[in-house]
Design a protein with these regions (language model features):
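Non-transmembrane domains of secretory- and envelope-associated proteins
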Residues: 1-19
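Conserved beta-strand hairpin/beta-sheet module of binuclear metal-dependent hydrolase folds
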Residues: 19-65, 158, 167
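Short, exposed beta-strand/loop patches in secreted or surface proteins that constitute
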Residues: 14-20, 37, 145-148
Length: 167
């Protein structure tokens, strides 16, 4: 069977639907998976980097539109399944610290958040590998509880266990 060129080169636009949940908190939907952006005094935290780089570049673009002039400093990752880690390298490349459970650390270091090129569908890290690490941490691993706080807003992140889905 020969795949027609139009089918092989088809692109599918990524659409991000934004819903304000509270002052400075947005649901970024429009696909099978969602992200949440939380505005702090001098940075943004995003929860979840699902699917693939294209989806996450669209989410990042929407966050920049919503909150210009504040960096995305943190990406909170809920678990290690492929549909939840597709954009982790994208956030790593823009200098965000990845917050995840400590059980994910070895897998992410070995297979995901490294500078090895992705050859089937090259991402930003593959195409433009950094010459040096971004300022700040690459990871924050948590065991039970973690707080992001800047004095005016606090976000509490908890490890909910036991959930066999994410173990």
């Amino acid at each position: 069977m020969v795949v027609p060129d139009k089918v092989r080169s088809a692109t599918f636009p990524v659409h991000v639907e934004t819903q304000a949940l509270a002052d400075g908190v947005w649901l970024l939907g429009g696909a099978s998976h969602n992200s949440v952006a939380v505005e702090f005094e001098d940075f943004i935290a995003v929860v979840e980097a699902p699917l693939d780089e294209e989806r996450n570049l669209a989410v990042i673009e929407e966050v920049v539109r919503l909150v210009p002039n504040k960096p995305i400093r943190f990406l909170v990752n809920t678990h290690q399944h492929h549909d939840h880690i597709g954009g982790l390298r994208t956030y790593m490349h823009i200098g965000a610290t990845i917050i995840t459970h400590w059980k994910n650390f070895d897998f992410y270091n070995r297979d995901v958040l490294n500078y090895a090129p992705w050859t089937l569908s090259p991402d930003m890290v593959s195409l433009w590998p950094p010459t040096e690490l971004a300022e700040g941490y690459q990871y924050e691993t948590i065991r039970e509880n973690y707080w992001l706080n800047n004095g005016t807003r606090s976000m509490h992140i908890s490890y909910v266990h036991p959930l066999t889905h994410v173990e």
